[in-house]
A protein has these predicted regions:
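Bacterial c-di-GMP phosphodiesterase EAL domain
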Residues: 232-236, 240-355, 365-368, 381-382, ...
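Conserved long alpha-helical elements within nucleotide-processing catalytic cores of c-di-GMP signaling
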Residues: 66, 70, 76-103, 109-139, ...
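Catalytic core regions of nucleotide second-messenger enzymes
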Residues: 99, 145-147, 162-166, 176-192, ...
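Cyclic nucleotide signaling catalytic output domains
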Residues: 144, 171, 175, 181, ...
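Membrane-interface helix-start motif
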Residues: 9-30
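Catalytic strand-loop-helix junctions within cyclic-nucleotide turnover domains
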Residues: 155-165, 183-186, 191-208, 233-237, ...
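Hydrophobic scaffolding residues in well-structured cytosolic catalytic/regulatory domains
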Residues: 65, 72-74, 83, 87-90, ...
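EAL-family c-di-GMP phosphodiesterase catalytic domain
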Residues: 184, 268, 285-286, 333-340, ...
Length: 487
């Protein structure tokens, strides 16, 4: 239990001196660690913020892509995909709740003229304005979409009455037919509308759209600027037209059943033939005689009017050589007139047949002139310089007959048969015809009256001062052999 020794430690530096050495190093280390932590925290926060912003941008891009996938770029309206989806949903809801859905297909009339005359920028502006007008007319529950260049579609869910749909269609026609003041110009278009109603016309989306399209086709064929509701007869009529188109194409292979007949143009006393009009006839092997009003329209729609028109022109050239004492008139379709190289092709045909252009008269309608006035005027001038006579057919039934007389160099006006038929029926009919005749003569034009069927009409037209008469009173269209006996 006795202490035998002890240990003693004597530091090199006393405690106070050690603290003065250790504390600064420790504080510096703590500061460095703190700064490193703050730097790391800042990097993490910055990265998080950047990631958040990237996610926001990605979300916006996805939203924009989603919008573009289902909306028209030009107008912002729903596109075909979105409209079809909403139509499918509306049809499903209508079946569940025993409601009706209306579908309207719209096609602008004469829109191509805007693009051709004023350029695509004007066309785009007009499309935007059409979209705006449509959006203002429909209900908030309706869907307005753009499904093509000048094609629009409207889905009307929960339709109460068909009268409600008809009222909307008429409002659309009125709104879209009003003038458009764009880029310093006043522009005009019309609209044709086809209607189909579910479940009456079908409960399938594709079937309903097909029937609305058939109704739209019917609206166009009845003069445009109107609406048509689908009827079963329209479907049957369309099938018949498609069959006739195929059969007409086959007939053109060797012109089987096709013939050119001629109706005489008489001098004012009805005693002498001064000209003949070439009129196409088609005798179908099983259907019999097909009305020109039917197959000519089909030929224009399908483009068959081009080879058909050339064939008629060749036949007319041959007839002009057989009947050198009269002028042979040939109708020129608007489709023909506007086709590329029309004038040069016509001159080639006449030259190849050895015909004299001065013995040929080309009949055009006002519809030819309104499409592209500058191009139409150039073509007419070229044709007249080549020796052809130009007649303005169906005068008085178009948009601005008097304006065209002063703007286009024609040789003859043909008063439409509707004015002739009104003689003795409408109080102002005689005064109208007399005014047209005076105007024509003042401009140095020949005036022909069409549709003369009675002696009374002939005398009234003679008293009005017409130069030539044409109609059933003198002769229907007959084969060339019959005309040769009359000349």
């Amino acid at each position: 239990g006795q202490r035998v020794g002890y240990l003693s430690w004597q530091p090199d530096k006393p405690g106070a001196q050690m603290l003065r050495t250790i504390v600064p190093s420790t504080l510096l280390s703590v500061l460095i660690i703190t700064l490193l932590c703050l730097f790391m925290v800042r990097r993490i926060w910055t990265s998080s913020l950047s990631l958040s912003q990237s996610l926001v941008r990605l979300g916006a891009s996805e939203a924009q892509a989603q919008h573009l996938a289902f909306h028209d770029v030009l107008t912002g309206l729903p596109n075909r995909a979105l409209v079809e989806d909403r139509l499918t949903q509306a049809l499903a809801a209508a079946l569940r709740h025993d409601r009706r859905v209306a579908l309207l297909l719209l096609d602008l009339d004469r829109f191509k003229n805007i693009n051709d005359t004023w350029g695509h920028h004007a066309g785009d502006e007009l499309i935007r304005e059409v979209a705006r007008r449509l959006s203002e007319i429909v209900r908030t529950s309706d869907t307005v979409g753009r499904i093509g260049g000048d094609e629009f579609i409207i889905v009307m869910p929960d339709t109460e009455t068909i009268g409600q749909v008809h009222t909307l269609a008429q409002r659309i026609i009125s709104a879209l037919s009003a003038p458009y003041h764009l880029l310093g110009n006043e522009l005009w278009v019309g609209v044709s509308i086809g209607l189909a109603l579910a479940p009456k016309d079908g409960v399938d989306r594709l079937e309903l759209m097909r029937k609305a399209d058939i109704a739209l086709y019917d609206a166009k064929n009845h003069g445009r600027g109107q609406f048509r509701q689908f009827e079963k007869a329209m479907d049957e009529s369309l099938r018949t037209r498609q069959e006739l188109a195929a059969e007409l194409r086959q007939a053109l292979v060797n012109f089987t059943g096709l013939a050119v007949w001629y109706q005489p143009l008489m001098e004012i006393n009805g005693e002498r033939v001064v000209g003949v009009e070439a009129l196409l006839r088609w005798h179908h092997p099983t259907r019999g005689d097909i009305s020109p009003a039917d197959f000519i329209a089909i030929a224009e729609e399908t483009g068959l009017i081009l080879p058909l028109g050339e064939w008629v022109l060749r036949e007319a050239c041959k007839t002009s050589l057989k009947l050198p004492q009269v002028v042979v008139a040939v109708n020129v379709s608007p489709v023909q007139f506007r086709s590329s190289g029309f004038v040069s092709r016509l001159l080639e045909i006449v030259a190849s047949e050895g015909a004299d252009p001065q013995r040929l008269e080309l009949e055009i309608t006002e519809g030819v002139l309104i499409e592209d006035e500058h191009a139409a005027r150039s073509s007419i001038i070229a044709l007249r310089e080549a020796g052809f006579r130009i007649a303005l057919d169906d005068f008085g039934t178009g948009y601005s007959s008097l304006n065209y007389l002063s703007s286009f160099p024609v040789d003859k006006i043909k008063i439409d048969r509707s004015f002739t038929q009104s003689l003795g029926v409408a109080d102002n009919s005689t005064a109208i015809i007399e005014s047209v005749v005076r105007l024509g003569h003042a401009m140095g034009l020949t005036v022909t009256a069409e549709g003369v069927e009675t002696e009374g009409q002939m005398h009234a037209l003679a008293n009005a001062g017409c130069n030539q008469l044409q109609g059933y009173l003198f002769s229907h269209a007959v084969p060339l052999t019959e005309i040769e006996k009359m000349v």
